[in-house]
């Protein structure tokens, strides 16, 4: 069953005696509004100028192919901040988690995520990010601490 925030919560009990919930959370814009930028080029006065955009801005400009394109027309360059081999390396995800929390950029499923952690429930993270499990785990451990 999914709620309005995209949170999936399941109960695998045939009787109501022993109830175990497990959760699946989509990270970006659901748990935290992350500051991670997408590297784009914006056509201004006939010249393509580098311009970084947020994930929410990307949702708007991605379909404007006349005025916006991926940096160097290369997805690897444009989305390098969403991987561990980008310019900030393996700490990129953790750094962005710290920034989002310090700026109180909590997204709609944040409270459910915290409740899940407090209750020791099993959960999974759904994401299009290319981070390895270890850096993502560091981000979750930072939240737990």
Language model segments and positions:
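Alpha-helical substrate-recognition element adjacent to the catalytic core
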Residues: 2-145
